[in-house]
Design a protein with these regions (language model features):
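Bacterial Sec-dependent N-terminal signal peptides
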Residues: 1-23
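Residue-level signal for mature regions of secreted extracellular proteins and peptides
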Residues: 10-13, 62-64, 90, 147
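An ectodomain-focused feature that recognizes extracytoplasmic/extracellular
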Residues: 18-73
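Short, surface-exposed loop motifs enriched in S/T, G, D/E and P with embedded aromatic residues
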Residues: 20-28, 33-34, 83-94, 137
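A structural detector for beta-sheet-dominated domains
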Residues: 23, 50-52, 59-63, 80-82, ...
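Extracellular/mature segments of secreted proteins
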Residues: 27-31, 78-80, 105, 161-163
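Mid-length scaffold segments of soluble, non-membrane domains
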Residues: 67-88
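Internal interaction segment
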Residues: 85-164
Length: 164
């Protein structure tokens, strides 16, 4: 009887695991396994989240040509959560004017606090501040908020399997 209830209790977790569709590849230089969400569209940007044994990399690509597309190491990204709390991170990518913005987190067995916040709180808006202090804001609707939360949760949980 206890097993029956424990199986019933775990069914929602199993149904989420089926929704977690990640692309499995190998890093072109190190040949280490790598997971990716692929590019997912959000308003005027696309997002790809990649994980390997060392880090989790968020790559935002600004697709709207009229928005500021130049970023350097002083550029920032701000995640605004429900309740108006914010998390601000610096660009970890190279200087470019192609609309590419990277945010990198360490891939650890225990999820870092900043990354944990992205998993547990719904993100209502994302603001990217470019070289000349111009801001590109991406406002997420309820469905996009849940989709983003699921993507981040999926890549973080599956990324832990790559840690050696």
């Amino acid at each position: 009887m206890k097993r029956f209830f424990s199986v019933i209790f775990l069914l929602p977790l199993l149904s989420f695991a089926q929704d977690c569709k990640l692309k499995k590849t190998k890093d072109q230089f190190s040949q280490e396994p790598k997971l990716s969400t692929g590019f997912v569209p959000f308003s005027s940007t696309t997002l790809s989240i990649d994980a390997d044994g060392k880090e989790i990399d968020f790559l935002f690509t600004i697709t709207n040509k009229s928005d500021e597309r130049c970023f350097d190491d002083a550029s920032t990204i701000s995640f605004v959560f429900e309740g108006k709390q914010k998390s601000i991170f610096r660009n970890t990518g190279t200087m470019n004017c192609e609309g590419l913005f990277h945010v990198t987190f360490k891939n650890l067995q225990t999820t870092p606090g900043n990354l944990q916040r992205l998993i547990t709180k719904k993100i209502t808006a994302i603001s990217l501040t470019g070289n000349n202090k111009s801001v590109t804001t991406i406002t997420l609707g309820p469905q996009q908020q849940q989709e983003l939360m699921n993507l981040i949760t999926c890549i973080v949980n599956e990324g832990k399997t790559l840690i050696k």
